Swiss-Prot record:
One of its GO terms (cellular component) is nuclear chromosome. HEAT repeats lie at residues 30-68, 473-511, 569-606, 957-996, 1139-1177, 1181-1216, 1219-1257, 1526-1565. ATP binds at residues 1329-1336. Residues 184-216, 241-283, 295-316, 699-740 are annotated as: Disordered. InterPro entries: ARM-like, ARM-type_fold, Helicase_ATP-bd, Helicase_C-like, Mot1, Mot1_ATP-bd, Mot1_central_dom, P-loop_NTPase. Residues 1316-1489 form the Helicase ATP-binding domain. This is TATA-binding protein-associated factor mot1. The keyword Cell membrane does not apply. Residues 699-710 have a biased composition (Low complexity). One of its GO terms (molecular function) is helicase activity. It comes from Aspergillus fumigatus (strain ATCC MYA-4609 / CBS 101355 / FGSC A1100 / Af293) (Neosartorya fumigata). Forms the NCT transcriptional regulatory complex with nctA and nctB. A motif (DEAH box) lies at residues 1440-1443.
């Protein structure tokens, strides 16, 4: 499964975790290396980027966990590191060491670049031919051989490459089978020169005959083969390729391929690792294979192809990864870009980690191996260079073109260069230099992709081998020359890479090449000025290079030198070249410009700031007004601040002349209003300037909202080129800002508009402060006018500007008094009647009122004279006068006027018009309310901003109520979070102002209100009085239920939203106070401390709560809850100096947890959890010492509830932080999972389910600091317990204290140890050992032991809790005798009562029940006698075959769950039979609530698992299913113990399962066809129905088909529609309906029995008389129906095999007699056969007397068949057990067997052998969770996908025509360019190289 998650994982986290898990498997099982790599390799070829990346990561991690290969390790020399080698190597000695075979490797010195470019096959996105399909159809070894054979040609090294047709005519002619000559497979040595060798010599037709096929037929066959090859191409094949060493000569067999690949049904053809009992697939013909199960003995697995094969001398001497790299190196040249990409990533990982061992061989000297290593790496370098030259694939998805292949190959080359000696690095560099320069490659014209590839290679060379660059001056010069050429290239993508190449070595280059700096800087600046295109890819890279270079003084000196020679090169001329990019359409470019400008502003030196002027100021400010990206906005403000500093330093503020003309428009723009949705107010575009300084044309302000196509000029669809040097028109610099300029709130959003106003206000505040400090003439006039502007947004902006200015200047500013005078009226006076920017709301209200009056006129026929007249102009309009339409007019119309007019209506008018009038009035009322709300919101904003400004100016009157109200209203109601934060800051400043003044003023009241607002949201802070009566419930559970539908959902949602806003504002203010005052918070604001502390001390000082706490007028209870809630809200922001104060409160919080009121416990639990997450050491210590002991308080349920609720919240609040403490919590929570209180139990099981999943992670976590020695000791004890719980093998040995009359096998002793462990910790579990392993015996041992120990304890202490209690065993009726017999045999000292039989018999036994040791009864009796069994307290309650309570609604299940017992145990060989919901029912008996409620379980587990089974399930659904099954498995793991027979019984002979097919008889076929014709239509109509009758009809039809498979006699009876027709048919044949000729299964059964020697005539001669002849085999024959048993008995035994002696066991046999029949069959060998029904004979019985099992019929439920066959295959069986399944070919029976397979897979994944311990998951099991009918390995469909197209829908929603392609079908996936940013980030790549 884990490797499936590489593909299906929906998030990088899941995929990376899967990769990590696979690496862990390798760490723990080093021998799995090649198997793992082989399984991951196919995912490198996936179409999905993420899958390939995850697979490469997995390979990297696995390879890192493998040992480094160094054959000369013992020589005592280290492998020389590439950096340490010397440049001059002794070449002669090397030549001597070369072996002849090295000629086959490519050599850097001899690489023919011109030939490669001239003749090499270009690598595009995909091949575009059937070539790749044909390759996919080959088996892997042949494919590798073919590709290596053609590689030299494809590289262009053997002249022009001509594509050969893989499917040639000879392939289509059948060839005589002759032994082929050996051919080389996968041999690297022959990869270059192998072109002349054919794969296998074509065989001439015998006697020179023609092939017998015409040309037309040949062409037809060829097309057909290509089609099937194409369909095979999508398969992901697990490269579990059989072990064939590459360099060995291997004979390719001519018939069967020995390479097991994934077959269509997802099963591997060489067998599966886990026993799959029912693997049938009709399409593959009959499954004649035998499945040998539980075969013990050393199996010899085939090695994977990736594993080098051993030689006669021993293990293979070569580098272990050589074969894999061979495959990957061939894939580097695959026509499909995805395959090239995956191969390059994998090679990068392998070479990075294991490259030093490549090419080395055991038995050679260190020197020889070093040369072999270099040769091998050189060869790979040559291949990578070839890819860089030939690759032409580019992706135009993001800002830049990304060439994923060239980038990844560049990284691979980087990884390789770190391993290469200097000499080879120089050779690589020389090749790259030639590729970039393209001067000597014989090209007619430069190829930009080739140059781009070379540049990428150079970039990684420079980054990885900086050491060589510093040493070798020629290398540095060459790199510089190449980069300069690249920067001047006509292609902007080449420029981008060139710029990025220089960034890592900028420092070295600047220090060593000062002479070339001037030239370089000229090129870089020219590069920027040439970027006319708005979408130029290289802009950001060039900008970053520029910013980096300009941080060096040497560069600045060079620029100054340039400027001295050429005035055009001065800073003043150069920097303005960046301005056009400030409003570039690409965010990253805008950000890069600001970074560059920031760098220039921070430069020191003469002339560096001459570009800083009024134009710059204006352009940066324009950024603030129109930028929508918050990150760029912040950068712009930083640049603005730096700009003002720079201007001040230069003295630009000494006179106003330069800047004033630029500043005034900015003030006007900042004050400009903006509108509301649908009614925008545009900015004044004429006040903007272009980068050139010219005014901005107003016509271009907004982009028209047209379709994108209309804006796209012709001819832009191809590659962006700069070759045609036409004069491009200058781009529209503000195109990106059109919507902001238009004020288009619908598209931009009001919050974005407000944010830009806030940033503009902050910038202007800074400017005004500097302006006023320089004593310049006042600019305040226009700003103060804004305070009286008709638009609210202008007033808001003006007030914010004043506030920002005041924050810097304080109360002592020059204009402070003037500002205060202008602000006070806003706070104290009336607001204007309306605002112009929301006049639209009033227009809508007027229109609705007008409509209402018209309704009176038109519908109620009220004369116009009686209707009021509405003014046309509304308040807020420019020409509005005193009589304009106002809000009060609107309220009058919908209020008094409406009532007056309604009163005047006649009854008749009322009847006709009232409904319409009421509806129209409601609409009008809604419009009026909306207008009122808009107006109130604007008033609130302006007042809050003015109040904030007054606080900043410290103009606080003696009665500050107006100011406080302005800010507090904003805290309460402001929807915009940023404005609310500003008000919170102002409140904080106000509180600070009062804390420093003599009088505290209103601080306490303000703090009190903030605390109150913080607690207003009932979802966070519950109401005390509303919940005061709850004592014995846990409020956390109630609050989950409260989230139901409310009667008035809209009103509830509105109120909840208001409460959330209020809490957000108050919390923000309190947090800011905590941050501002730090450790002095409680001293400065003692009221806050008192509001938290006082109620807790008052309420909890005594042992009991105050008696009057529940009185409605008593507020103490609410104050306690509020105090705890407030502490929880602001604690994360507390200064650490306040922690001791909080720790002092902890005992009170613990006391609150013990309180008898649910609501206080709830608040305390949440508060305690937060304290633990912030002050972890003290909090957790208190938890362990004080809270956890409460959880076991048997006497006080409130203590237990408080503790468990606290733990529940702790888990949710601390998340990962709880890991070091998990171990402390598990055992206490575990103990409460069987609590008598339902709510404690529910919360404990929910918490435990979360904790148990964290336990495996806990061990690796270091000890948290500050834990006391005592706690650490305690943790070790708990760890021991957890280890025992998770691994049965670690459980302490349990000495059985009673004399059990049996010798326990080791695994049975382990089982008893586990049961004793559960007993000791009061846990409950399921013993689900395989059938026949002795579950009964293990149970008897623990029950008898526990009874004995309780009796001893009682004798010693007389404690009532250990008094004698009976134990109850509930089992199916046929097993009651079996239990009595086993108890008598193994524990005769126990007094056993069998509570079975008829009611009279049972009533006689009732009095004996309480005194018995063991009571055995059946499920039916449990249901019927519930009132007898319920009152008894049982010690153990054991459910044998416990899966019988799988249906939670069945009466027997409900009855069993009512029984009270100390210990609950389920025995079941098959706990999951059909679906996982059954497991929920079992756990609902064991530990109710552990798996959540049934609904929760369904949603979380059952539905995703079921959904993942369907063939059309998406990869998302498959992942959800895989994750759900994994989570469920981990959660139930500690409570199930399962061992399989093949694991523990070495002495058990194998079980062989065979399918025995028989063809339907003529009569059966006829009846099938008639039934199908007549019933099919009716059945199709009913399949989707939910009607009970329809379901029954379908069920009956299925039953009919099943019966017909067995014998026509079961269906053709009187009343059957074709009864007479069939009778005539039989009469004509002289036959009868029961004749075995018509039921082939019966004749097959007879043949089978005779083959087994059953029913054959006894030998006529010899010592034995016929009577005493015993058959060599004895059989169990299972049928589903009793009727079928009758037919077998009468037609086969009585007529055909009369000598067979048989017994019969079915439902007609009384339960009490069944065990006798079993005993007779086991002990008397003269009985040949036992006939059974699966339902009666399939459970629990021991029938080891038989060694043959025959299924005449099959159950839908696979576990019933498995149970049945294991009646014979169990302990005591000495012979091989043969299981035969009789199947009627081509019928419903095959469908049943296919369905069985899925059910078995689910069951074996949730409950598997791991439940014997949490070991490492079996890799095969991790890999395939669901082996369904299709290839589960891939999200793509298998090769016969065309057959699954029924009902598929195409992209337009129409039903797909079969075989027809959709227009999107061939499109690869689209992805997010973040994948590129993450994958191709140079810094992260270098980090991995170091790591």
């Amino acid at each position: 499964m884990t490797s499936r998650l590489l593909e299906t994982g929906s998030t990088p986290f899941i995929r990376n975790t899967a990769a990590q898990q696979l690496a862990d498997v390798q760490k723990q099982h080093p021998d799995e290396l090649f198997n793992l790599l082989g399984r991951i390799l196919p995912y490198l070829r996936s179409k999905s980027w993420d899958t390939r990346a995850a697979a490469a990561k997995a390979i990297g991690l696995i390879v890192a966990n493998a040992d480094t290969f160094d054959p000369n390790q013992d020589d005592g020399q280290e492998i020389k590191k590439a950096e340490n080698d010397d440049l001059d190597v002794d070449i002669k000695s090397e030549e001597e060491l070369l072996s002849p075979m090295d000629d086959s490797l490519l050599q850097l010195e001899r690489l023919d670049l011109p030939s490669i470019l001239k003749y090499g096959k270009r690598l595009l996105g995909s091949a575009g031919k059937e070539y790749e399909y044909s390759l996919a159809a080959m088996d892997p070894a042949s494919r590798l051989q073919h590709q290596k054979k053609t590689l030299t040609s494809r590289l262009g090294l053997a002249g022009e490459y001509i594509e050969e047709d893989l499917i040639n005519d000879n392939d289509l002619v059948s060839k005589p089978v002759v032994k082929e000559e050996p051919s080389f497979v996968a041999s690297r040595e022959h990869s270059i020169q192998g072109t002349s060798q054919p794969l296998a010599s074509p065989i001439e037709p015998a006697n020179g005959e023609e092939s017998g096929l015409s040309k037309r037929q040949l062409n037809q066959l060829k097309r057909k083969n290509k089609q099937s090859a194409r369909m095979g191409a999508n398969k992901v094949r697990v490269v579990d390729l059989s072990s064939r060493r590459a360099s060995e000569n291997v004979t390719t067999p001519s018939v069967a391929t020995p390479y097991p690949i994934k077959s269509e049904n997802g099963e591997e053809r060489n067998g599966d690792s886990k026993p799959d009992y029912f693997s049938l697939d009709r399409s593959a013909g009959d499954d004649e294979s035998k499945i040998v199960s539980e075969f013990k003995g050393a199996s010899v697995p085939e090695n994977p192809l990736l594993q080098p094969e051993s030689t006669e001398e021993g293990p293979n001497p070569n580098w272990p990864f050589e074969l894999m790299c061979d495959i990957l190196m061939v894939d580097l040249f695959d026509p499909n870009w995805e395959i090239r990409h995956g191969a390059a990533m994998a090679l990068r990982e392998v070479i990075r980690i294991q490259g030093a061992g490549a090419g080395r061989v055991q038995g050679k000297s260190r020197a020889e191996n070093d040369i072999l290593n270099r040769k091998w790496l050189d060869d790979l370098a040559c291949r990578l260079l070839c890819v860089l030259m030939l690759d032409r694939f580019g992706d135009y998805i993001s800002d830049n073109v990304v060439a994923p292949i060239r980038e990844t190959v560049g990284q691979t080359l980087g990884a390789l260069l770190s391993q290469l000696p200097s000499r080879s690095v120089i050779s690589v560099y020389k090749c790259l230099y030639r590729i970039i320069m393209q001067t000597d490659l014989g090209l007619e014209r430069p190829i930009w992709e080739v140059c781009h590839g070379g540049m990428i290679g150079l970039r990684y060379l420079v980054a990885v081998r900086k050491d060589l660059l510093i040493k070798d001056s020629k290398l540095m010069d060459g790199v510089l020359e190449a980069v300069m050429k690249g920067l001047g290239d006509y292609d902007d993508d080449v420029r981008a890479v060139s710029a990025a190449t220089l960034v890592p070595i900028a420092e070295e280059f600047v220090k060593t090449r000062q002479s070339t700096l001037g030239t370089l800087m000229t090129i870089v600046w020219d590069c920027l000025s040439n970027l006319q295109d708005d979408l130029s890819a290289s802009t950001g890279s060039v900008m970053d290079l520029l910013a980096k270079l300009c941080t060096f003084q040497e560069v600045l000196d060079a620029m100054k030198a340039n400027a001295a020679v050429n005035p055009e090169s001065s800073f003043g001329k150069l920097v303005p070249r960046l301005y056009p990019f400030l409003r570039h359409t690409i965010t990253s470019v805008r950000s890069a410009v600001l970074r560059a400008l920031m760098t220039f502003l921070q430069l020191e030196g003469e002339g560096t700031d001459e570009w800083v002027d009024g134009k710059t100021v204006r352009l940066i400010f324009q950024n603030l007004l129109v930028e929508r990206n918050e990150g760029v906005l912040k950068q712009s403000l930083q640049v603005w601040s730096e700009l003002l500093n720079s201007l001040e330093t230069r003295g630009s503020f000494k006179s106003e002349s330069d800047l004033l003309s630029h500043i005034k428009p900015l003030i006007t723009l900042s004050m400009g209003p903006f509108g509301v949705p649908r009614y925008p107010v545009p900015m004044d575009a004429s006040l903007f300037i272009k980068p050139s300084g010219l005014p901005f044309p107003s016509s271009a302000a907004a982009p028209a909202r047209s379709s994108p196509a209309s804006n796209t000029p012709e001819g832009t669809k191809g590659r962006r080129r700069k070759s045609e040097k036409k004069e491009a028109p200058p781009p529209s610099a503000h195109n990106v800002d059109g919507h902001m300029l238009q004020g288009d709130i619908d598209l931009v959003g009001a919050d974005t508009m407000l944010r830009s106003k806030i940033y503009a206000a902050r910038a202007l505040g800074q400017l005004l402060f500097v302006w006023d400090q320089n004593q310049l003439p006042s600019l305040w006039q226009s700003i103060l006018e804004g305070l009286n502007h008709s638009a609210s947004t202008s007033q808001l902006a003006s007030a914010m500007i004043v506030e920002e200015y005041a924050k810097l200047s304080g109360p002592s500013g020059r204009y402070a008094s003037t500002l205060c005078e202008n602000l006070r009226p806003i706070i104290e006076g009336e607001r204007p009647p309306w605002y112009s920017d929301i006049a639209c709301y009033l227009h809508v209200a007027r229109a609705q009122c007008h409509s209402l009056l018209n309704t009176f006129r038109d519908h109620a026929h009220v004369p116009g004279s009686r209707l009021p007249v509405l003014a046309v102009i509304v308040q807020g309009d420019p020409e509005a006068g005193p009589n304009a339409f106002s809000l009060s007019d609107a309220e009058k119309v919908i209020g008094p006027d409406f009532e007056r007019l309604k009163k005047g209506l006649t009854p008749a008018q009322r009847i006709t018009a009232l409904q319409v009038l009421n509806d129209t009035r409601a609409t009008a009322e809604s419009a009026v309310n909306e207008a009122r709300n808009a107006r109130e919101q604007r008033d609130l904003r302006v007042r809050a901003a003015a109040a904030g400004a007054l606080v900043a100016l410290s103009d606080i009157p003696k009665k500050p109520s107006h100011i406080i109200k302005g800010m507090m209203d904003s805290i309460k109601k402001e929807e915009n979070a940023e404005l609310q934060q500003r008000s919170a800051t102002a409140i904080t400043s106000l509180v600070e102002y009062y804390t420093t003044s003599a009088k505290r003023g209103p601080v306490d009241k303000v703090i009190g209100n903030l605390v109150k607002y913080c607690c207003v949201d009932t979802s966070e802070t519950p109401e005390f009085h509303h919940n005061a009566m709850l004592e014995k419930s846990i409020l956390s559970l109630r609050k989950e239920e409260d989230r139901r539908d409310h009667p008035d959902a809209a009103k509830f949602e509105r109120e909840a939203k208001e409460a959330r806003i209020m809490r957000r504002g108050a919390k923000e203010a309190l947090e800011q106070l905590a941050v501002k005052f730090g450790s002095e918070l409680m001293a400065k604001v003692p009221n806050l401390a008192s509001l938290i502390e006082r109620p807790l001390k008052e309420a909890l000082a005594a042992d009991e709560l105050p008696a009057n706490i529940r009185d409605p007028e008593n507020e103490l209870g609410q104050e306690v809850v509020d105090g705890l809630s407030t502490l929880r809200a602001i604690l994360p922001k507390f200064h650490s100096g306040l922690y001791p104060w909080v720790v002092d409160l902890l005992p009170l919080v613990v006391k609150a947890l013990q309180c008898n009121l649910s609501v206080i416990r709830y608040a305390a639990a949440k508060c305690f959890a937060t304290i633990c997450s912030v002050i972890t050491v003290e909090g957790m210590t208190m938890l362990v010492e004080k809270v956890l002991p409460m959880i076991n308080d048997a006497l006080d349920v409130h203590h237990r509830q408080g503790a468990v609720e606290c733990i529940y919240h702790l888990i949710h609040v601390m998340e990962d932080g709880i890991l070091p403490y998990v171990i402390f919590l598990v055992v206490p929570v575990l103990g409460r999972m069987s609590d008598s209180d339902n709510e404690v139990r529910l919360l404990a099981t929910t918490s435990f389910a979360t904790l148990v999943k964290l336990v495996p992670l806990e061990a690796g976590i270091p000890d948290p600091p500050g834990l006391s020695e005592e706690l650490l000791k305690g943790r070790d004890r708990e760890r021991q317990f957890m280890a025992q719980m998770l691994d049965v093998r670690k459980v302490e040995e349990f000495k059985i204290p009673v004399a059990i009359k049996a010798e326990l096998r080791p695994y049975q002793q382990e089982g008893v140890n586990w049961l004793a462990f559960l007993n000791r910790y009061n846990l409950h579990g399921i013993l689900c050992d395989d059938m026949g392993l002795g579950k009964t015996l293990q149970t008897i041992c623990i029950v008898a032991s526990d009874h004995h120990m309780r009796a001893e304890e009682f004798a010693r202490t007389q404690k009532p809790e250990v008094r004698k209690l009976p134990s109850l065993i509930v089992c199916p009726p046929s097993l009651s005798g079996h239990w009595q017999q086993e108890l008598k045999q193994y524990a005769p000292f126990l007094n056993c009562v069998a509570y079975v039989g008829p009611p009279a018999e049972r009533s006689r036994l009732q009095s004996a029940l309480p005194n018995a040791d063991i009571v055995v009864t059946s499920y039916d009796i449990c249901r019927n006698d519930n009132e007898v069994l319920n009152p008894i307290n049982w010690n153990y309650c054991v459910l044998d075959e416990g899966h019988l309570i799988k249906n939670p609604k069945a009466k027997a299940t409900i009855a069993v769950k009512r029984l009270l017992s100390n210990h609950r145990l389920i025995l079941s060989g098959t706990p999951i039979q059909n679906n996982v919901l059954e497991l929920w029912s079992l756990f609902d008996f064991l530990m109710p609530g552990f798996l959540g409620t049934e609904k929760v379980f369904l949603d979380r587990f059952a539905k995703p698992i079921a959904a993942s089974r369907f063939s059309k399930s998406s990869s998302k659904e498959q992942e959800a299913g895989a994750l759900a099954i994994e989570a469920l498995h981990k959660q139930v793991l500690p409570f199930l113990l399962r061992r399989l027979k093949e694991e523990v019984l070495n002495d058990l002979p194998p079980k062989i399962i065979q399918n025995y097919y028989c063809d339907p008889s003529e009569l059966q076929r006829k009846l099938f066809e008639d039934f199908t014709k007549k019933e099919q239509k009716a059945l199709q109509d009913k399949v989707g129905s939910t009607e009970k009758a329809d379901k029954e009809h379908i069920f009956q039809a299925l039953q009919y088909m099943r019966r017909l498979c067995n014998s026509p006699a079961l269906v053709v009876k009187e009343g059957h529609k074709q009864y007479n027709e069939v009778q005539q048919y039989l009469a004509a044949k002289h036959s009868n309906i029961r004749d075995v000729a018509h039921a082939p299964k019966l004749s097959a059964l007879r043949d089978l029995l005779i083959d087994c020697g059953i029913g054959v005539d006894s030998p006529s001669e010899g010592d034995l008389s016929g009577a005493s002849y015993v058959s060599p085999h004895r059989a169990l024959i299972f049928c589903q129906m009793k009727e079928m048993l009758d037919i077998v008995q009468s037609e086969v035994f009585n007529k055909l095999l009369p000598s067979v002696q048989f017994l019969r066991l079915d439902g007609s046999v009384e339960a009490t007699r069944r065990q006798d029949i079993v005993n007779r069959f086991n002990t008397d060998p003269s009985y040949d056969v036992l006939l059974l029904t699966t339902s009666v004979g399939g459970l629990g019985l021991n029938l080891t007397g038989a060694d043959t099992v025959i299924f005449v019929e099959h159950d839908w439920n696979p576990q019933k068949d498995i149970q049945a066959m294991d009646r014979a295959h169990r302990i005591g069986q000495k012979k091989v057990v043969n299981v035969y399944r009789l199947i009627t070919r081509g019928t419903l029976e095959e469908k049943i067997l296919n369905l069985q397979r899925f059910k078995i897979d689910v069951a074996s994944t949730v409950v598997n052998q791991q439940n014997a311990g949490l070991g490492t998951m079996d890799t095969d099991q991790l890999l395939d969770l669901f082996n369904l009918g299709e290839t589960a390995e891939t999200a793509e469909k298998p090769s016969d996908a065309a057959g699954n197209e029924v009902d598929m829908v195409d992209i337009d929603g129409n039903v797909k025509e079969k075989g027809k392609k959709g227009w999107l079908d061939d499109l690869g996936e689209l992805w997010d360019d973040r994948q590129y940013q993450e994958e191709y980030n140079l810094d992260s790549f270098l980090a991995t190289m170091k790591g």
